[in-house]
Amino acid sequence: MIEGDLIPAGHSLTEQARTHARTYNLRDHGFQVSDGPLFTAQEAALIKQHAQRVLNGVYETGVPPRTNTGGPDASVHPAYIEAQMPQDCDDVIASAIRHPGVARWAAEISGARRLKIWNAMVMQKRPSGGEKTKVGWHQDRRYNDNITRGPTMTVWIALADVPSALGPVRYVPRSHLWNRHFQTGFFDRDIDRQEREFDIPAGEIWQSVEAVLPAGWAVAHGPDVLHGSGENCGDAPRTSLLLSLGIDDFQVLPAHYFASRQNDPRAAPIIYPSGG
């Protein structure tokens, strides 16, 4: 078992992210780091501010998100909080999910002719949350198969610097090629047990790569790659924006909540091509 990729000590966060951007790609490894910021520093700071407002239960449009595990009393927030469909309640976030730089990059790395948002979330992993800030190894397909048909991808954007101490998203390169449907889940935090039990195909190796990111940078992944994250051992929250994208002629299953939002251009815009 190989734990971690070998980046020399002392490399800056930007150098680490650029190394990952050069080394790993969506097709061959199941994930890809942007080769630069998709949001400017000012954009990332503004979106982070509005993400925090939403997570604190402040909804500028008067419309709540679909779910919010935060709320007005931050003292009782759990260690990991998220709000789903925050574009309904905040204009800055509604604009951010349509950002042309994000759309162009996602289309470029995926080869998509068309990209449509079907879900979005703002998320925060709080410091000193211990085990409760871990996210177990999982494949998005385990969840997406109950919602969508056809190709999908996820884009995860850092709204502030995410060094290793904050528990960045981590990936198992090439695991999307193993032809395995693992039943491990997001909230299964016994990561050591998970790793002992995984059935790794002959000729493949286990490698865990942390997608450390400067503010405004992104990492994208497909539905079959194993990913998760460690605990936040740092001194700042890990705050991010997540976009779930449908590629080309994907469909949302008609019985699901998200199907009811697909004709709403604020909730589920076509972000590529622009004006689509």
Where are these regions (language model features)?
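Active-site region of the double-stranded beta-helix
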Residues: 113, 141, 146-149, 157-168, ...
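Short proline/glycine-enriched turn/loop segments at secondary-structure junctions
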Residues: 230-234
